[in-house]
Amino acid sequence: MADLAQLEEQIVGLSLLDAAELVKKLESRLGVSAAAAAPVMVAGGGGAAAAAPVEEKTEFTVVLTAAGANKINVIKAVREVTSLGLKEAKDLVDGAPKTVKEGVSKDEAATIQKKFQEAGATVEVK
């Protein structure tokens, strides 16, 4: 066991050029090719990478980016969505870009976005 630990330390201490030379010597002596194993790993990694984008985001943030020309309707929409008071809703609209709601479902985010767009505001769902 001590021999393996010592061998490991020696291999880890090799420079890249020495490690590449060691690989070539081991390939010829053992009759294997390290290059043949690499595509298998890449193909497996590619499958895992392709599976990751399939996961859908479950929580969204709705951000009011611009109030538009009809601020009154936008303030009303903010009050409906957030149940804020009149002053707080006005401050939110005047301070755009501001987060209107966080951690909402995809359907709720789409509903909120539609409501704000109908009121004349520009909204971004993140």
From Swiss-Prot:
Query: What would be an example GO MF term here?
Result: structural constituent of ribosome
What's an example GO cellular component term for this entry? cytoplasm
Q: One GO BP annotation here?
A: translation
Keywords from UniProt, A to Z, are: Ribonucleoprotein, Ribosomal protein
Which SUPFAM superfamilies does UniProt cross-reference here? ClpS-like, Ribosomal protein L7/12, oligomerisation (N-terminal) domain
Q: Which family does it belong to?
A: Belongs to the bacterial ribosomal protein bL12 family.
HAMAP family in the record? Ribosomal_bL12
Family annotation (NCBIfam families): L12
Query: What subunit structure does UniProt give?
Result: Homodimer. Part of the ribosomal stalk of the 50S ribosomal subunit. Forms a multimeric L10(L12)X complex, where L10 forms an elongated spine to which 2 to 4 L12 dimers bind in a sequential fashion. Binds GTP-bound translation factors.
Function noted in UniProt = Forms part of the ribosomal stalk which helps the ribosome interact with GTP-bound translation factors. Is thus essential for accurate translation.
What name has this protein been given in UniProt?
Large ribosomal subunit protein bL12
User: Native species of this protein?
Assistant: Koribacter versatilis (strain Ellin345)
Query: Which gene does this sequence derive from?
Result: rplL
